[in-house]
Design a protein with these regions (language model features):
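Short carbohydrate-recognition loop motifs
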Residues: 81-101
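Extracellular carbohydrate-recognition regions
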Residues: 26-71
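Extracellular-facing segments of soluble proteins and assemblies that are Gly/Ser/Thr-biased and enriched
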Residues: 102-181
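Extracellular carbohydrate recognition
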Residues: 250-272
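Extracellular carbohydrate recognition and processing domains
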Residues: 177-239, 258
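Surface-exposed, short loops/turns at beta-strand junctions within beta-sandwich domains
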Residues: 3-10
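Beta-strand-rich extracellular modules
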Residues: 17-21, 247-249
Length: 273
């Protein structure tokens, strides 16, 4: 059974009941502290080539594919001062074909909790995840999505001339930490190079809670709309890390999607019930 309506960060006492008779022993439990995501309104940015999603001198929590696309003189993820929910900016994730001197690849507009670690040719090696120990019940955010027509494809599941799809997913887990070239405590190491591909697995036994929304249609109008993504828990274990990814092209890791796809995100909030 599940109890709702409890206040976060509060210690409660309870007694077991046998019919109408209460047990003599009283026990306690403490509800989760309502931890939130840093820079969840995407107000803080710095740099230009590449553009980073945190203020100068601050601590990185979010990153994007800009480190990779910058080698081709483009940022796939930028801020937008015109299409937003509140504050000064939203994050604008715009899928593009990035090329320089005839060499290039399709790159999905994306944002993720973690860090872009290394460029490997036209591919990337990424850290997914940051420390996080709470158990939110859902993710609430505001978004706008424009789904373009697929013009780059390596997958039969999403061929050229079909409609692109975006995605937003969140995972809480207790992944064994890895190390890569000086970067320590990596929850999930992602490699997009086809010969060495290593992607996030939502079915991993280390995933404690997971929620996802696949964006199959463009949203109506030019404003952002509210979206709630429930987080389904598979275990009562306490997580050690959080992963959150938004992408204008769901299959961008396979260099598949549309250069006409754009996803705006703003005001992400974790809800505790």
């Amino acid at each position: 059974s599940q109890i709702t309506g409890l206040e976060p960060g509060i210690t409660y006492e309870y007694q077991a009941m046998a019919g109408t008779v209460a047990a003599k022993e009283t026990k306690q439990f403490t509800t989760e502290a309502p931890a939130q995501l840093p820079n969840a309104g995407f107000e803080d940015w710095h740099g230009s080539s590449p553009l980073y999603i945190y203020k100068s001198g601050g601590e990185m929590f979010w990153d994007s594919g800009n480190t990779g696309s910058d080698t081709m003189n483009k940022n796939v993820t930028t801020y937008d001062a015109t299409i937003k929910h509140s504050g000064n900016y939203s994050a604008k994730l715009q899928s593009q074909y990035v090329a320089l001197f005839g060499i290039g690849a399709f790159a999905a507009g994306n944002v993720f909790v973690g860090k872009f670690l290394k460029i490997d040719g036209t591919d990337g090696i990424l850290r997914f995840g940051r420390p996080f120990t709470s158990r939110p019940s859902k993710l609430v955010l505001y978004y706008r999505y424009v789904a373009g027509t697929v013009d780059y494809s390596t997958l039969s599941e999403l061929p050229k001339n079909s409609k692109d799809m975006g995605s937003i997913y969140i995972a809480l887990g207790d992944w064994p930490h890895q190390t890569f070239e000086g970067e320590t405590d990596i929850p999930v190491l992602v490699k997009t190079k086809p010969a060495d591909r290593q992607l996030f697995d939502s079915n991993s036994s280390n995933v404690i809670g997971y929620g996802e929304c696949i964006l199959k249609e463009s949203t109506e109008g030019e404003g952002l709309i509210k979206l709630e993504i429930p987080i389904n828990y598979r275990s009562n274990r306490k997580p050690t890390d959080i992963i959150l990814v938004g992408s204008a092209s769901r299959y961008g890791d396979y260099f598949t999607g549309s250069t006409g796809s754009t996803l705006w995100l703003d005001d992400l909030e974790l809800i505790y019930e």
